[in-house]
Amino acid sequence: MVSELCEELSIAQNIVDTPKKGCPVIFTPHGLYQTLLSPLLVSFSGTNLSKNLSSLCGKEGEKLFDEKIILSVDPHIDYSPASRNYDDEGVVTKKNILINKGIFDSGLYDLKTGSESSKKSTGSAGRSVHSNPSPTTSNIVMDEGQITINNIISDIDEGILVDHLLGAGQGNELSGNFSANISLGYKIEKGEIIGRVKNTMISGNAFDALRDIEEISFERDQVYGSMMLPYLHTKNVEISS
């Protein structure tokens, strides 16, 4: 870990020009959640599905995403702070597959939203002392791919690696739209990371970006203690400076 931090610090000290528009984009596990999964998960909530606010309404069983994507919520991962055997309504929890090889498999429901949608609770209720129960996530897991991140990067002539965003979540999340400044991102040139980009913005739509992806990495990292996510390479993202 220390050597990785030192390498990142060394690369970040070299400020380089923003890549050209239309170039490939790789998201780190952190960048993947902030940019694509955070707005996407809003549409899987039973609250929005039961009110017909989600663009996923009535589309269970349809192929809406790239077949490389398997995304699930698993409350039974050992030693995770988000794991639990029962949700906050006392319903037994289970692993819920949201996207299965690109197919929209299931939303996340508590008792109320499940009843409103003619569905059973998925054991996804969460609440605080200040709120009523509502659908929530536990451990978010995306299955790994077959190629290493080093091999993904080595195949890119010019591109960008997005790690952290500033102002994520400011777009219309129900539509999947996002637009944010890159607070930490790197330029890829001739298969190597050459430096850090500044004053750069990315925008696009999470559904479009996940509908046709290039690669998912074999490596996965833990994000915020309750997510296990890979690196993801897509082209359907706009870059501007």
PLM regions and their residue ranges:
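N-terminal small-residue-enriched
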Residues: 1-241
